[in-house]
Amino acid sequence: MLNIIINAYACSPNMGSEPGMAWDWFINLAKHCELHIITEGEFKEKIETALPTLPQGKNMHFYYNPVSDEIRKMCWNQGDWRFYKYYKQWQWKTYEMAKDIIAKQKIDIIHQLNMIGFREPGYLWKIENKPFVWGPIGGMKQFPEAYLQGSGIKMQVFNKLKNKINIYQIKHDKRVHRALTKADLLISSIPDSYYAIKKYKHLESVIIPETGCFKSELL
């Protein structure tokens, strides 16, 4: 059985969006692998309550890296740019925790799971001699400018500028570049991410939607 260490800031068994996505990945991976999961502590009680109810729960080992309530409010208040300073600090502490776990546990694979936005790849890619997986990767989709016809000048300027900044960051952000090129496997959340990684970095990735499911679940 493979042993995987996973970085997932957001995780909850009782939510959708990023927290629910991470939980769904974990409960399926844990059927086949031993997981060592570093996550933020907001939903610790819900996680610890859910684990004993799962047959694969014994394969899911959680390590909590909590932040303050104030920082959590910044996270949920989308658009609060102050959060990213603390999120970057959280990622560095997670990197330190991961190194400590790897020193004590037999780890086969490192996985950077969420948040899925490409702008913050964390630091686990810096760990040597372990295969590194990053994804699903999102945030690379360009806003269709055709949708801006008839909108106000403020909306047009905002979205056109956002598109340009996105491309600039994909092409020139040094840490993003290092994480992308270090990865043994890249996972794109949507085709737009796949094509952006291919176009600007000349790298291959596989497309697995963040809300992916088994074919059997569709029947």
Feature map (PLM): residue ranges:
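N-terminal subdomain of nucleotide-sugar transferases
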Residues: M1-N59, A103-Q105, H177, T181-L185
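Acceptor-binding helix/loop patch of EC 2.4 sugar-transfer enzymes
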Residues: Y9, D69-W81, K130, W134-K174, ...
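Soluble, non-transmembrane catalytic domains of enzymes that act on hydrophobic metabolites at membranes
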Residues: A10-M15, G20-N28, E42-K46, I102, ...
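A conserved catalytic-core segment of Leloir-type glycosyltransferases
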Residues: H36-K93
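Short loop/helix-cap segments at secondary-structure boundaries that form the rim of catalytic
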Residues: I47-L54, Y123-E128, Y195-K201
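Donor nucleotide-sugar binding/catalytic pocket of nucleotide-sugar-dependent glycosyltransferases
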Residues: M60-Y64, W134, I165-L219
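An amphipathic, basic-hydrophobic alpha-helix
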Residues: R72-Q112, F118-E120, I167-T181
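An aromatic- and histidine-rich active-site surface loop
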Residues: Y86-Y95, K99, I109-L148, P191-Y194
